[in-house]
Protein backbone atom coordinates (compact mmCIF):
# COMPACT_ATOMS: atom_id res chain seq x y z
CA UNK A 1 0.00 0.00 0.00
CA UNK A 2 1.43 3.39 -1.01
CA UNK A 3 1.82 6.45 1.16
CA UNK A 4 -1.01 8.14 -0.73
CA UNK A 5 -3.29 5.25 0.23
CA UNK A 6 -2.41 5.83 3.89
CA UNK A 7 -3.07 9.54 3.49
CA UNK A 8 -6.55 8.91 2.12
CA UNK A 9 -7.30 6.50 4.98
CA UNK A 10 -6.21 9.18 7.45
CA UNK A 11 -8.55 11.63 5.77
CA UNK A 12 -11.43 9.26 6.18
CA UNK A 13 -10.61 8.66 9.84
CA UNK A 14 -10.50 12.38 10.61
CA UNK A 15 -13.33 13.40 8.33
CA UNK A 16 -15.96 10.73 8.80
CA UNK A 17 -17.72 9.98 12.07
CA UNK A 18 -19.08 6.64 10.88
CA UNK A 19 -15.95 5.31 9.21
CA UNK A 20 -16.23 1.74 10.42
CA UNK A 21 -19.68 1.40 8.86
CA UNK A 22 -18.23 2.36 5.51
CA UNK A 23 -15.42 -0.12 4.96
CA UNK A 24 -16.49 -0.79 1.38
CA UNK A 25 -16.36 2.91 0.52
CA UNK A 26 -12.90 3.20 2.06
CA UNK A 27 -11.52 0.38 -0.06
CA UNK A 28 -13.24 1.72 -3.16
CA UNK A 29 -11.46 5.01 -2.62
CA UNK A 30 -8.10 3.30 -2.16
CA UNK A 31 -8.59 1.32 -5.37
CA UNK A 32 -9.23 4.50 -7.34
CA UNK A 33 -5.73 5.88 -6.75
CA UNK A 34 -3.89 5.93 -10.08
CA UNK A 35 -0.09 5.84 -10.11
CA UNK A 36 -0.26 6.65 -13.83
CA UNK A 37 -2.13 9.90 -13.18
CA UNK A 38 0.26 10.84 -10.38
CA UNK A 39 3.27 10.20 -12.62
CA UNK A 40 1.67 12.26 -15.39
CA UNK A 41 1.09 15.17 -13.00
CA UNK A 42 4.66 15.01 -11.69
CA UNK A 43 5.95 15.03 -15.27
CA UNK A 44 3.80 18.06 -16.05
CA UNK A 45 5.05 19.98 -13.01
CA UNK A 46 8.67 19.14 -13.91
CA UNK A 47 8.05 20.42 -17.46
CA UNK A 48 7.81 24.01 -16.17
CA UNK A 49 11.61 23.98 -15.81
CA UNK A 50 11.73 25.78 -12.50
CA UNK A 51 8.99 26.48 -9.99
CA UNK A 52 11.17 28.75 -7.86
CA UNK A 53 9.06 31.28 -5.95
CA UNK A 54 10.89 34.16 -7.67
CA UNK A 55 10.80 32.65 -11.16
CA UNK A 56 8.80 33.73 -14.22
CA UNK A 57 5.12 34.49 -13.59
CA UNK A 58 4.16 35.57 -17.13
CA UNK A 59 5.10 32.60 -19.32
CA UNK A 60 2.56 29.84 -19.87
CA UNK A 61 5.31 27.24 -20.22
CA UNK A 62 7.93 28.06 -17.60
CA UNK A 63 8.10 29.21 -14.00
CA UNK A 64 5.97 29.38 -10.88
CA UNK A 65 3.22 31.35 -12.63
CA UNK A 66 2.60 28.68 -15.26
CA UNK A 67 2.71 25.96 -12.59
CA UNK A 68 0.14 27.57 -10.31
CA UNK A 69 -2.20 28.35 -13.21
CA UNK A 70 -2.02 24.71 -14.31
CA UNK A 71 -2.80 23.50 -10.77
CA UNK A 72 -5.76 25.89 -10.53
CA UNK A 73 -7.06 24.63 -13.88
CA UNK A 74 -6.76 21.01 -12.68
CA UNK A 75 -8.80 21.83 -9.56
CA UNK A 76 -11.39 23.56 -11.76
CA UNK A 77 -11.62 20.50 -14.03
CA UNK A 78 -12.12 18.29 -10.98
CA UNK A 79 -14.83 20.65 -9.75
CA UNK A 80 -16.62 20.56 -13.11
CA UNK A 81 -16.78 16.78 -12.82
CA UNK A 82 -18.43 16.86 -9.38
CA UNK A 83 -21.12 19.45 -10.11
CA UNK A 84 -19.02 22.42 -8.95
CA UNK A 85 -18.31 20.77 -5.58
CA UNK A 86 -15.02 22.65 -5.15
CA UNK A 87 -14.54 26.34 -4.41
CA UNK A 88 -11.32 27.13 -6.29
CA UNK A 89 -9.39 30.36 -5.79
CA UNK A 90 -5.99 31.96 -5.23
CA UNK A 91 -5.01 33.06 -1.73
CA UNK A 92 -2.15 35.54 -1.97
CA UNK A 93 0.15 37.72 0.09
CA UNK A 94 2.93 40.18 -0.71
CA UNK A 95 6.39 39.38 0.66
CA UNK A 96 8.93 42.18 0.73
CA UNK A 97 11.83 40.78 2.73
CA UNK A 98 13.50 37.60 3.91
CA UNK A 99 16.87 35.86 3.80
CA UNK A 100 15.85 34.12 0.57
CA UNK A 101 13.78 36.93 -0.93
CA UNK A 102 15.88 38.88 -3.44
CA UNK A 103 13.07 41.21 -4.46
CA UNK A 104 9.45 41.74 -3.32
CA UNK A 105 7.03 39.21 -4.77
CA UNK A 106 3.47 37.95 -4.55
CA UNK A 107 3.03 34.51 -3.02
CA UNK A 108 0.06 32.66 -4.51
CA UNK A 109 -1.51 29.59 -2.89
CA UNK A 110 -3.98 27.58 -4.97
CA UNK A 111 -6.97 26.58 -2.81
CA UNK A 112 -9.85 24.18 -3.48
CA UNK A 113 -12.50 23.71 -0.77
CA UNK A 114 -14.84 20.71 -0.63
CA UNK A 115 -17.59 21.57 1.86
CA UNK A 116 -18.68 19.04 4.45
CA UNK A 117 -22.33 18.03 4.69
CA UNK A 118 -22.61 18.35 8.49
CA UNK A 119 -19.79 20.63 9.58
CA UNK A 120 -18.96 22.97 6.67
CA UNK A 121 -16.76 25.21 8.84
CA UNK A 122 -14.63 22.35 10.23
CA UNK A 123 -11.67 21.75 7.96
CA UNK A 124 -9.06 19.11 7.25
CA UNK A 125 -6.28 20.62 5.14
CA UNK A 126 -4.26 18.57 2.67
CA UNK A 127 -1.37 20.44 1.09
CA UNK A 128 1.55 20.05 -1.25
CA UNK A 129 4.25 22.60 -2.03
CA UNK A 130 4.28 24.05 -5.53
CA UNK A 131 7.75 25.61 -5.52
CA UNK A 132 11.16 24.07 -6.16
CA UNK A 133 14.79 25.21 -6.05
CA UNK A 134 18.35 24.06 -6.72
CA UNK A 135 21.07 24.00 -4.05
CA UNK A 136 21.42 27.77 -4.20
CA UNK A 137 18.10 29.05 -2.83
CA UNK A 138 18.61 32.45 -4.47
CA UNK A 139 19.02 31.04 -8.00
CA UNK A 140 15.60 31.46 -9.58
CA UNK A 141 16.71 31.20 -13.22
CA UNK A 142 18.24 27.73 -13.65
CA UNK A 143 16.15 24.59 -14.01
CA UNK A 144 15.00 23.04 -10.74
CA UNK A 145 12.73 20.13 -11.73
CA UNK A 146 11.85 19.13 -8.15
CA UNK A 147 10.15 15.87 -9.15
CA UNK A 148 10.31 14.47 -5.63
CA UNK A 149 10.63 17.77 -3.75
CA UNK A 150 7.90 18.52 -4.19
CA UNK A 151 6.03 17.72 -7.38
CA UNK A 152 5.27 14.34 -5.81
CA UNK A 153 3.45 15.93 -2.88
CA UNK A 154 1.54 18.35 -5.12
CA UNK A 155 0.55 15.54 -7.47
CA UNK A 156 -0.62 13.48 -4.50
CA UNK A 157 -2.81 16.36 -3.33
CA UNK A 158 -4.36 16.74 -6.79
CA UNK A 159 -5.01 12.99 -6.99
CA UNK A 160 -6.68 13.03 -3.58
CA UNK A 161 -8.94 15.85 -4.78
CA UNK A 162 -9.87 13.87 -7.89
CA UNK A 163 -10.95 10.89 -5.83
CA UNK A 164 -12.36 12.35 -2.62
CA UNK A 165 -14.43 14.96 -4.49
CA UNK A 166 -16.65 12.11 -5.68
CA UNK A 167 -17.77 11.42 -2.11
CA UNK A 168 -19.55 13.25 0.69
CA UNK A 169 -17.92 13.83 4.08
CA UNK A 170 -19.08 15.28 7.38
CA UNK A 171 -16.29 17.87 7.52
CA UNK A 172 -14.84 20.10 4.84
CA UNK A 173 -11.59 19.28 3.04
CA UNK A 174 -9.19 21.91 1.75
CA UNK A 175 -6.78 20.86 -1.00
CA UNK A 176 -4.05 23.46 -1.41
CA UNK A 177 -0.86 24.07 -3.33
CA UNK A 178 1.42 26.20 -1.16
CA UNK A 179 4.04 28.55 -2.60
CA UNK A 180 7.13 30.06 -1.04
CA UNK A 181 7.98 27.00 1.05
CA UNK A 182 11.62 26.84 0.00
CA UNK A 183 12.08 30.57 0.59
CA UNK A 184 10.74 30.60 4.15
CA UNK A 185 7.37 28.83 4.49
CA UNK A 186 5.62 31.97 3.27
CA UNK A 187 2.68 30.18 1.68
CA UNK A 188 1.88 28.27 4.85
CA UNK A 189 2.09 31.41 6.96
CA UNK A 190 -0.21 33.25 4.56
CA UNK A 191 -2.77 30.44 4.61
CA UNK A 192 -2.68 30.35 8.43
CA UNK A 193 -3.48 34.05 8.58
CA UNK A 194 -6.25 33.62 6.01
CA UNK A 195 -7.70 30.71 8.00
CA UNK A 196 -7.81 32.79 11.18
CA UNK A 197 -9.36 35.76 9.40
CA UNK A 198 -11.97 33.49 7.81
CA UNK A 199 -12.81 31.80 11.12
CA UNK A 200 -11.92 28.30 9.94
CA UNK A 201 -12.07 25.55 12.56
CA UNK A 202 -9.05 23.54 11.43
CA UNK A 203 -9.08 20.06 12.98
CA UNK A 204 -6.29 18.42 11.01
CA UNK A 205 -3.48 19.17 8.56
CA UNK A 206 -1.57 16.80 6.29
CA UNK A 207 1.30 18.38 4.36
CA UNK A 208 2.69 16.06 1.70
CA UNK A 209 6.41 16.64 1.30
CA UNK A 210 8.52 14.32 -0.89
CA UNK A 211 6.03 11.45 -0.87
CA UNK A 212 7.75 10.04 -3.95
CA UNK A 213 10.87 9.14 -1.98
CA UNK A 214 10.84 5.64 -0.50
CA UNK A 215 14.60 5.25 0.12
CA UNK A 216 16.05 6.46 3.40
CA UNK A 217 19.50 7.92 3.99
CA UNK A 218 20.56 4.48 5.21
CA UNK A 219 19.59 2.92 1.87
CA UNK A 220 16.57 1.10 3.27
CA UNK A 221 13.61 1.12 0.87
CA UNK A 222 10.22 1.35 2.59
CA UNK A 223 6.91 2.49 1.07
CA UNK A 224 4.78 1.40 4.02
CA UNK A 225 5.89 3.90 6.65
CA UNK A 226 5.59 7.63 7.27
CA UNK A 227 8.62 9.79 7.93
CA UNK A 228 7.54 12.72 10.08
CA UNK A 229 9.31 16.06 9.72
CA UNK A 230 8.14 18.86 11.98
CA UNK A 231 9.24 21.83 14.02
CA UNK A 232 7.49 23.69 16.85
CA UNK A 233 5.30 26.52 15.62
CA UNK A 234 3.15 28.33 18.14
CA UNK A 235 0.16 29.40 16.08
CA UNK A 236 -1.75 31.18 18.83
CA UNK A 237 1.16 33.32 19.97
CA UNK A 238 1.84 34.57 16.46
CA UNK A 239 -1.63 34.98 14.99
CA UNK A 240 -4.01 35.44 17.93
Residue spans of the language-model regions?
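A non-catalytic alpha/beta surface segment that caps or lines the substrate-entry region
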Residues: 40-115
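Metal-dependent peptidase/peptidase-like ectodomains
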Residues: 178-240
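Solvent-exposed loop/turn segments at secondary-structure junctions
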Residues: 50-53, 94-98, 117-119, 130-134, ...
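Bacterial Sec-dependent N-terminal signal peptides
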Residues: 1-23
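Alpha-helical metal-binding/catalytic segments enriched in His/Glu/Asp
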Residues: 112, 126, 130-132, 136-184
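Structural recognition of the beta-strand scaffold that forms the well-ordered cores
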Residues: 29, 37-47, 54, 87-90, ...
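Second-shell loop/turn segments in exported
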Residues: 24-33, 51-63, 97-101, 139-150, ...
Amino acid sequence: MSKLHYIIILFLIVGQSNLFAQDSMMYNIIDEVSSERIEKDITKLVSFGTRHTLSDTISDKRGIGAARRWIKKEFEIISSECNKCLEVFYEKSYVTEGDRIVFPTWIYNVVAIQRGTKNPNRFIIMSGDIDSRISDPLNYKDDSPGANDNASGMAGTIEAARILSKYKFDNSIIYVGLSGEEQGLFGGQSLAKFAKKSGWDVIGILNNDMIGNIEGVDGVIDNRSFRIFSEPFFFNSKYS
